[in-house]
Design a protein with these regions (language model features):
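Generic marker of residues within folded, mature protein domains
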Residues: 6, 57, 69-71
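A generic structural signal for beta-strand entry/edge sites
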Residues: 13, 44, 74-76
Length: 85
């Protein structure tokens, strides 16, 4: 799958490395929802996880956000959410 046109590194406003939270048993969904709600049109929120966060992607897509996830060269998954309206 090709990277969508809206995923531009210069538009990433926030990057959250969720690995420390997940290691503590904390699910970052609420934080992601709060951060994404504050995004301006075109801004991107990136979350880094050791697995594809499928339920989170589904919830954010259902809330009207554009979503895209890719496996990085570091073995981590980089998932992007944007309010592109």
């Amino acid at each position: 799958m090709n990277t969508p046109e809206w995923v531009k590194k210069e538009n990433i406003k926030i990057t959250l490395d969720a690995r420390p939270l997940l290691a503590q048993g904390i699910h970052p969904l609420e934080q992601v929802q709060q951060e994404c709600a504050a995004l301006q049109p075109g801004e991107i929120f990136e979350i880094i996880t050791p697995f594809p966060p499928a339920p989170m992607i589904e919830k954010m897509a259902a809330a009207g956000f554009e979503t895209y996830s890719e496996s990085g060269g570091d073995g981590m998954f980089h998932t992007f959410f944007s309010n592109i309206q």
